[in-house]
Every structure is written in structure tokens, then in C-alpha cells.
Amino acid sequence: MNGIPFEHGLIVAAILFSLGLCGLLIRRNLLFILMSIEVLMNASAVAFVVAGSRHGQVDGQIMYILVISLAAAEASIGLALLMRMYRRHHTLNVDSVKEMHG
């Protein structure tokens, strides 16, 4: 049974990465920035799996598990910081928080 072609998998990973990067650069809401970082991490994880399947090794799947666990830790810490920032400043806009500090 053949999977998807190598080039198609990398194209999907590149599209996901570019969407995450656009969200990271365009959005000013901290929640959307955190979601964009998650999309970036998932794109790199997909690239690891595709590269591992190309060479017939399970290293890509092992790296996928590592990236997913890292993303879970990053999400929990990021959401805790997000809740703290919202309680303190009553906004999630990154620009307005920068202006408050002077």
C-alpha cells in the first residue's frame, strides 16, 4: 500500500507552515498568536513524518510524538500566561499591553 507522494506531503507541510507564519505575523490577539504557533509546530511534525516515511524509518514518527508533547506543554504554559495577562490588563491585544508599560 502506497501513501501519499513525498512531494505532496511536503507541500501540505509548507502550506501549513506558511499559514501559521502569516497568522503569527498578522494577528495581534495573543490567543490567535498561540494558535498560529501550534499550527507551525504541527507543520514541522508533518514534515518529520513525511521525511521518515520517505526513508522507511520510524524516526519521523518518534519526532512527531516529541513535537506533539512539546506543543502540549507550550499550549498549557501559553494559556496560563494568557489568562494572567487577561486578568491583569483586561485585553489580549499585544500592542495595547506594550503601550501600557510605556
Swiss-Prot record:
Q: Under which EC number(s) is this enzyme classified?
A: 7.1.1.-
Taking the first listed entry, what is the main subcellular location of this protein, grouped into a coarse class? membrane
Q: Per the UniProt record, which residue ranges are transmembrane?
A: 6-26, 30-50, 62-82
This protein's record includes keyword Membrane: yes
- Could you state a single Gene Ontology molecular function term? NADH:ubiquinone reductase (non-electrogenic) activity
**Keyword Translocase belongs to the record:** yes
The parts of the chain that form a coiled coil are: none
Subcellular location per UniProt equals: Cell inner membrane
Lineage, top-rank taxon, reads: Bacteria
State the Pfam families in the record. Answer: Oxidored_q2
Membrane topology type, per the record? Multi-pass membrane protein
Q: Which key words are in the record?
A: Cell inner membrane, Cell membrane, Membrane, NAD, Quinone, Translocase, Transmembrane, Transmembrane helix, Transport, Ubiquinone
This protein's GO CC annotations: NADH dehydrogenase complex; plasma membrane
Reactions listed under catalytic activity: a quinone + NADH + 5 H(+)(in) = a quinol + NAD(+) + 4 H(+)(out)
Give the GO terms filed under biological process for this record: ATP synthesis coupled electron transport
Per UniProt, subunit arrangement is: NDH-1 is composed of 14 different subunits. Subunits NuoA, H, J, K, L, M, N constitute the membrane sector of the complex.
- Similarity-based family: Belongs to the complex I subunit 4L family.
**What biological function has been recorded for the protein in this entry?**
NDH-1 shuttles electrons from NADH, via FMN and iron-sulfur (Fe-S) centers, to quinones in the respiratory chain. The immediate electron acceptor for the enzyme in this species is believed to be ubiquinone. Couples the redox reaction to proton translocation (for every two electrons transferred, four hydrogen ions are translocated across the cytoplasmic membrane), and thus conserves the redox energy in a proton gradient.
Stated name of the protein: NADH-quinone oxidoreductase subunit K
Organism per entry: Tolumonas auensis (strain DSM 9187 / NBRC 110442 / TA 4)
